[in-house]
Structures are given as C-alpha cells and as structure tokens.
Amino acid sequence: MPKMKTKSGAAKRFLKTASGYKHKHAFKSHILTKMSTKRKRQLRGSSLIGPSDVAKVERMLRVR
C-alpha cells in the first residue's frame, strides 16, 4: 500500500501551531472597494480554525 498523500492545497493554507491550526481570513483578495474599512481591518491577520473543522483539516493534512 503506497503512502497517503497530503492535500497540497490544504498544506498551503493551514499551519499547525501549539494551540491548533492557523489560517488566513477569506474575502480579502480583490474587489475591496465596496467593503468598509472596519470590515477590512477585522479581516486582517490570521485566526485559528474552529473545533468543528479540526478533524476535516487533519484528514486533509493526513495527521491521523
């Protein structure tokens, strides 16, 4: 049986940290003129994925 491959798209998007998986916010790439300054500011930086998505991300990254 060959080794399971990691989903390369997921490997580019998620980073394992001590407290969970880090990811960049969505809706921050283009057509930002319609979006308010407050909304753009809130989407800055990165955050941790929610507890309901941890199992899905780990499966894509072949953690378990």
Curated annotation (Swiss-Prot):
SUPFAM superfamilies: L35p-like (SSF143034). One of its GO terms (cellular component) is cytosolic large ribosomal subunit. It comes from the Bacteria. GO terms for biological process: translation. The keyword Phosphoprotein does not apply. Transmembrane segments: none annotated. GO terms for molecular function: structural constituent of ribosome. Keywords: Ribonucleoprotein, Ribosomal protein. Belongs to the bacterial ribosomal protein bL35 family. This is Large ribosomal subunit protein bL35. It comes from Ectopseudomonas mendocina (strain ymp) (Pseudomonas mendocina).
